[in-house]
Amino acid sequence: MQIGKIVKVSGPLILAENMSDASIQDICHVGDLGVIGEIIEMRGDVASIQVYEETTGIGPGEPVISTGEPLSVELAPGLIAEMFDGIQRPLDTFQEVTHSNFLGRGVKIDALDREKKWTFEPTVAVGEEVSAGDIVGVVQETPIIQHKIMVPFGVSGTIAEIKAGDFAIDETVYSVETAKGTESFSMMQKWPVRRGRPILEKLSPKVPMVTGQRVIDTFFPITKGGAAAVPGPFGAGKTVVQHQIAKWADVDLVVYVGCGERGNEMTDVLNEFPELIDPTTGESLMNRTILIANTSNMPVAAREASIYTGITIAEYFRDMGYSVAIMADSTSRWAEALREMSGRLEEMPGDEGYPAYLGSRLAEYYERAGQVIALGKDHREGSITAISAVSPSGGDISEPVTQNTLRVVKVFWGLDSQLAQKRHFPSINWLQSYSLYSTEVGQYLDLELQGNWAAMVAEGMRILQEESQLEEIVRLVGIDSLSDKDRLTLETAKSLREDYLQQNAFDDVDTFTSRTKQAKMLQLILTFGEEGQKALSLGTYFSELMAGTVEIRDRIARSKYLPEEELEKLDRLQAEIKTTIKEIIAEGGMTND
């Protein structure tokens, strides 16, 4: 391989000549330090290289060596509960090697531990036919995730030899007799991050993902295999929404990509997740989490790689048949990295200086999410759910990143700074947000809960929309101008907002609400509104209704803090609502006139 020579350094972009043997997307070692870079443009024998580390001190004349390989990730046991940087360097190992709390440059570290032994149990026998995607053995990586070792893409033949026992990830565990001869394989695969892993078939997602957040699960649900965007201004709670979903979503694995956001937020995850218990498995949340940290003070170019690194790892576990959620916080910082590199390459800018290909790059990322049938004999079904925060400057969702994102995602959770200022969290605006999965999820849950979930959700949304129209009248002519029925609608909507949609992420009980509890809580509020309207139509006064239901309304408000084991109390409360309102009808209204 030829050795190139640096001719220009411009921040994270380096131009090197004498690179005619190299190809686009090749990884290079740049300068005397050997920092890692990727070729993003070729003009004659001059390569433009985006460097994933700090370029301070690198100058013209220093060597550039191309590896001839694209940016790839290592896929093997040892990924879970690890924290990597944007190009899959393990941060704890980095600290052990460099004895520094800061990222040194040009440090060459294996992404996964080559020393640690894993117990490999074969699931196929010698002589069996295998092809790409077939499972040849399993490793119990964490108490809840069984790591399935799959035949690499492009390989098919007969098992010639397979071992059982404890092995490191780079030791040979099986060999396959192929048309070209016998090939040996370890537990590790490498895969280029910019290329999606092949699948057998893409399915239409229908199964809802339970997040435990009432406003999401009820009004704006997402399915396993769906894609959602969480745009909002600073301080509206994007990161807390993502952390909540990462903690409580009923998926098998979470890949959390901190892309250009504050380092403190990744520290929060590292401190909180090991202590929290997953409600579905009873194990520590860290046993199902992979972290990719590319904080705002890390090199800009590595942000661009971190999103691809995360989605490739997610695809690997999806191919095993797991449901995976990938959180990207935030894609706006990723788009800013694209904008910076595009500007340094002197490309023609599009809207607000972003490159013209911003939309296609975003679509490329989101289209790698979905519910699929993976390669392999057993037709495993797996899914990737992509949930990304978008940070539009000033909360302006008409800017290019948000608009291009909304074209490709089907769920929009719009965060509202006014709700956040009122301390209403999660501050998802129920009048602006939408989910295009609502119909499928409603039909699915009507069957699962054996009830009228879709009708309850529609009624709840109708009340909230009616409230916004009535508020206009109240602002103009005052609340006294409203009829008793309209005042009850406002009271029911207030209960929906404060007792149902508002949720305390820092309360041990309220942080997560099961689907059953959500249905019972929503039924309570709607029953109160429905029975109250009946009472008013029979002549009861609004003031009498409010005075007679103070204790009932207080108990509805406190129902969110009721533990999951005591849900039968909600059934009793529902019966009491009806009884209490019947007593008010019997005592009051026109009979006292």
UniProtKB/Swiss-Prot annotation:
Record bears the keyword ATP-binding: yes
GO MF terms, alphabetically ordered: ATP binding; proton-transporting ATP synthase activity, rotational mechanism; proton-transporting ATPase activity, rotational mechanism
A Pfam match: ATP-synt_ab_N
Gene Ontology, cellular component aspect: proton-transporting ATP synthase complex
Binding residue positions for ATP: 232-239
Domain of life (superkingdom): Bacteria
Cross-referenced InterPro entries: ATP-synt_VA_C, ATP-synth_a_Xtn, ATP_synth_asu-like_sf, ATPase_a/bsu_AS, ATPase_F1/V1/A1_a/bsu_N, ATPase_F1/V1/A1_a/bsu_N_sf, ATPase_F1/V1/A1_a/bsu_nucl-bd, ATPase_F1/V1_b/a_C
Signal peptide start and end residues: none
Reactions the enzyme catalyzes: ATP + H2O + 4 H(+)(in) = ADP + phosphate + 5 H(+)(out)
Keywords: ATP synthesis, ATP-binding, Hydrogen ion transport, Ion transport, Nucleotide-binding, Translocase, Transport
GO biological process assignments: proton motive force-driven plasma membrane ATP synthesis
EC numbers, comma separated: 7.1.2.2
Functional note: Produces ATP from ADP in the presence of a proton gradient across the membrane. The V-type alpha chain is a catalytic subunit.
Protein family (similarity comment): Belongs to the ATPase alpha/beta chains family.
Family matches, as PANTHER family: H(+)-TRANSPORTING TWO-SECTOR ATPASE, V-TYPE PROTON ATPASE CATALYTIC SUBUNIT A
Protein name: V-type ATP synthase alpha chain
Encoding gene (name): atpA
